[in-house]
């Protein structure tokens, strides 16, 4: 069976086409706040793939999701938008109001949560998200500005400091302003993760664009980097979705 999986974020649209659980095509593109228009440009390509179903993770509002739904109707196959539930597939949501939890975080937790295992799941994307699980119970988590948001905020709110692009590659004290900024921001986020990891034993799992960078500084916790974690969560969601 061929399936199309869509991850529609605030700035990017990612898609995977799988056949018998194997990824046969994957792409990610900036959608410039118009994901429906980007999807419209891909629809003919999708139409020739012999797809059987579509699973979607979307952070968009209802109006934009409805536009996405209308475009995908042209493929004439079942479409499922993943949602956050108080309980799903045995996983208990840790939020008081489940709908306030981001669907991307929910799917990442759904992908890995299992009985008798505790996880710390770090999403290294536009924001740094941290979710904790104890068995099949989601415990909630934390959201922090990522490396680049912190740097940009510092630039915008500090007169007289010009900070060019530079690698976040070191935790040592900076010997110049550029290094002091980059090393300080990275140290702050790494220290936050370490503080959480030291509270109780748990497996550390990293996903997102900067996952490998963070893993480099967290080696003592034996981090696992999962590049397609959201896809796995979306597949898990569809596997437990009620059949008509």
UniProtKB/Swiss-Prot annotation:
EC number: 2.7.1.33
Gene3D superfamilies, per the entry: 3.30.420.40
Gene name, Swiss-Prot/TrEMBL: coaX
PANTHER family given in the database record: TYPE III PANTOTHENATE KINASE
A biological process from GO: coenzyme A biosynthetic process
This protein's pathway: Cofactor biosynthesis; coenzyme A biosynthesis; CoA from (R)-pantothenate: step 1/5
CDD domains cross-referenced by the UniProt entry: ASKHA_NBD_PanK-III
Alphabetized HAMAP family for the sequence: Pantothen_kinase_3
Positions of substrate binding: 95, 102-105, 177
Reactions it catalyzes: (R)-pantothenate + ATP = (R)-4'-phosphopantothenate + ADP + H(+)
Cellular component annotations (GO), alphabetically ordered: cytoplasm
Catalytic machinery residues: 104 (proton acceptor)
UniProt protein name: Type III pantothenate kinase
Organism: Acinetobacter baumannii (strain ACICU)
CC cofactor note: A monovalent cation. Ammonium or potassium.
Keywords: ATP-binding, Coenzyme A biosynthesis, Cytoplasm, Kinase, Nucleotide-binding, Potassium, Transferase
Gene Ontology molecular function: ATP binding; pantothenate kinase activity
């Amino acid at each position: 069976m061929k399936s199309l999986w869509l991850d529609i974020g605030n700035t990017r649209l990612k898609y995977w086409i799988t056949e018998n659980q194997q990824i046969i095509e994957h792409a990610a593109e900036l959608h410039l706040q118009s994901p429906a228009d980007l999807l419209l440009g891909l629809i003919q390509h999708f139409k020739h793939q012999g797809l059987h179903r579509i699973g979607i993770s979307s952070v968009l509002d209802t109006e934009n999701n409805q536009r996405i739904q209308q475009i995908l109707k042209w493929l004439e196959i079942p479409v499922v938008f993943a949602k956050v539930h108080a309980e799903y597939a045995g996983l208990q949501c840790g939020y008081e109001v489940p709908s306030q939890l981001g669907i991307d975080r929910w799917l990442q937790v759904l992908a890995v949560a299992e009985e008798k295992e505790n996880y710390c799941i770090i999403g290294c994307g536009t924001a740094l998200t941290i979710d904790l699980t104890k068995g099949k119970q989601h415990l909630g988590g934390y959201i922090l500005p990522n490396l680049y948001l912190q740097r940009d905020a510092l630039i915008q709110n500090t007169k007289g400091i010009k900070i060019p692009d530079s690698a976040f590659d070191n935790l040592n004290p900076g010997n110049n302003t550029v290094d002091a900024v980059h090393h300080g921001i990275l140290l702050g986020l790494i220290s936050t993760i370490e503080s959480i990891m030291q509270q109780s034993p748990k497996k550390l799992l990293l996903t997102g664009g900067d996952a490998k960078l963070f893993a480099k500084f967290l080696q003592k916790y034996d981090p696992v980097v999962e590049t397609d974690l959201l896809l796995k969560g979306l597949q898990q969601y569809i596997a437990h979705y009620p059949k008509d």
